[in-house]
């Protein structure tokens, strides 16, 4: 349960991976929120004169071992720990202990799947809530708590997964809670995530966390950054690295260009000669580089998902839990009305019902269409058949110069809005710049007619035929789990569309998947790109594009006005389709670059 540090095997004294050997892997450790480092200041709503507790191994803390015992499957062990903690904190002489442990108590009251824990600490907080100005805790600012899967859910698989996560980490974080809508996917996601982040592998554990920080910073995702900074310290990472990239090893700095390209213009990565990464005194082994590519793409994807679902900061980990500093959101959980949703939903339902009978006709007519033009049109929002919003599309360009982030977000249909957004205010931009430095590239649309780069053919380099093989060669445990994750998201269906049942949503899901990869410059010869504009409304395309290109610009309006009547769990499913397709596309660009280098040697 407790992070006991790492073996030194596979690391130099400075914590860098040793040499180029992929046979020396780092042994896993796990983290607990009850080992918060004092670097994190307490959230303003609780006061500004104290910090979350230091490691529970601190002998001066009489409650440390009891808090850790809450992460026990044994009911009696938990009961004893709860009684001791509550009795100790109820002593009027122990007010300082309450202050020191308040974030932890809030977490236990709101993020535990065990009723004995959540009820005990919720009851403890009630009489002191006003005294300590404890804010209302929210999992997401887009959806009411009542619509989320309960932590003590009756669904057996979801309950087991929530309990396993709590027993390992001491909390069911907001990201996990949201994914509880889709427990079968959550199970596969956790297996893959734990493998690439915590199991033995080419890179040290704290390097994995830091690469996650660098990737999340590209999309200004403070939620992911806070989680990874915390776990970085749990894994004995050098706290100086968290001051920014000026304090990290040259070997890690060399990866910044790759991260920048994968985040914003991955189609330029094949033009980058990665020989500088694998040669010299700060060289990456191929195994380390493959692991890094998987990590980068994972955290770019996760950052997009956080913004898609409006996930709120974690108590005790973020620099501020005062939502007013990050969101301009009323307390109302009322959905923003989407006037076009009913009509568009009826249209797409009819299309889905009739699609099977039309498939043969489409196959016969394929040769009549210019596939290159269809591919181009799929990326043009103005070509969407469901023009239910007045969206201005982003102008394509043949240049590789970057565009201003604010300009990009507005041209993509975001505009100025008073709706809540997860992007940070301008006075907090420096928080991300320390992890970005001079690598200031932002999104520019892929131009299908550009002479400066090529369309990426999925037939010439695909995940199944090529990417999987490369990952399995250098990181064999990860390859099948990534494959399962991709396959499951693509095929996952409940045969429902809003309240309509027995609906085959494959054409709709397929349109989302291939639209994302079209935005990333990837062509699938065997897909009819006319389906993109047939099934996706302009506003939905706008949401999906933001999710995979500049997710920090997503607003509550974007989430609420997708052009279709979708339930929150269906919007989560839609978001997963988008970000997992993005993850696969980015990973293919990264792995293709590695293969290119190997072929040239």
Curated annotation (Swiss-Prot):
<keyword id="KW-0539">Nucleus</keyword>
<dbReference type="GO" id="GO:0010629">
    <property type="term" value="P:negative regulation of gene expression"/>
</dbReference>
<feature type="glycosylation site" description="N-linked (GlcNAc...) asparagine">
    <location>
        <position position="388"/>
    </location>
</feature>
<feature type="glycosylation site" description="N-linked (GlcNAc...) asparagine">
    <location>
        <position position="322"/>
    </location>
</feature>
<feature type="compositionally biased region" description="Polar residues">
    <location>
        <begin position="1"/>
        <end position="11"/>
    </location>
</feature>
<feature type="glycosylation site" description="N-linked (GlcNAc...) asparagine">
    <location>
        <position position="406"/>
    </location>
</feature>
<dbReference type="GO" id="GO:1990253">
    <property type="term" value="P:cellular response to leucine starvation"/>
</dbReference>
<dbReference type="GO" id="GO:1904630">
    <property type="term" value="P:cellular response to diterpene"/>
</dbReference>
<comment type="similarity">
    <text>Belongs to the sestrin family.</text>
</comment>
<feature type="region of interest" description="Disordered">
    <location>
        <begin position="355"/>
        <end position="425"/>
    </location>
</feature>
<feature type="compositionally biased region" description="Low complexity">
    <location>
        <begin position="21"/>
        <end position="32"/>
    </location>
</feature>
<keyword id="KW-0963">Cytoplasm</keyword>
<feature type="glycosylation site" description="N-linked (GlcNAc...) asparagine">
    <location>
        <position position="20"/>
    </location>
</feature>
<feature type="glycosylation site" description="N-linked (GlcNAc...) asparagine">
    <location>
        <position position="438"/>
    </location>
</feature>
<dbReference type="InterPro" id="IPR006730">
    <property type="entry name" value="Sestrin"/>
</dbReference>
<dbReference type="GO" id="GO:0071233">
    <property type="term" value="P:cellular response to L-leucine"/>
</dbReference>
<feature type="glycosylation site" description="N-linked (GlcNAc...) asparagine">
    <location>
        <position position="499"/>
    </location>
</feature>
<dbReference type="GO" id="GO:0016239">
    <property type="term" value="P:positive regulation of macroautophagy"/>
</dbReference>
<dbReference type="GO" id="GO:0005829">
    <property type="term" value="C:cytosol"/>
</dbReference>
<dbReference type="GO" id="GO:1904262">
    <property type="term" value="P:negative regulation of TORC1 signaling"/>
</dbReference>
<dbReference type="GO" id="GO:0070728">
    <property type="term" value="F:L-leucine binding"/>
</dbReference>
<protein>
    <recommendedName>
        <fullName>Sestrin homolog</fullName>
    </recommendedName>
</protein>
<dbReference type="GO" id="GO:0005634">
    <property type="term" value="C:nucleus"/>
</dbReference>
<dbReference type="GO" id="GO:0016684">
    <property type="term" value="F:oxidoreductase activity, acting on peroxide as acceptor"/>
</dbReference>
<feature type="region of interest" description="Disordered">
    <location>
        <begin position="1"/>
        <end position="58"/>
    </location>
</feature>
<feature type="compositionally biased region" description="Low complexity">
    <location>
        <begin position="380"/>
        <end position="425"/>
    </location>
</feature>
<comment type="function">
    <text>May function as a negative feedback regulator of TOR function.</text>
</comment>
<feature type="compositionally biased region" description="Basic and acidic residues">
    <location>
        <begin position="368"/>
        <end position="379"/>
    </location>
</feature>
<dbReference type="Pfam" id="PF04636">
    <property type="entry name" value="PA26"/>
</dbReference>
<dbReference type="InterPro" id="IPR029032">
    <property type="entry name" value="AhpD-like"/>
</dbReference>
<dbReference type="GO" id="GO:1901031">
    <property type="term" value="P:regulation of response to reactive oxygen species"/>
</dbReference>
<keyword id="KW-0325">Glycoprotein</keyword>
<dbReference type="GO" id="GO:0032007">
    <property type="term" value="P:negative regulation of TOR signaling"/>
</dbReference>
<feature type="glycosylation site" description="N-linked (GlcNAc...) asparagine">
    <location>
        <position position="330"/>
    </location>
</feature>
<feature type="glycosylation site" description="N-linked (GlcNAc...) asparagine">
    <location>
        <position position="387"/>
    </location>
</feature>
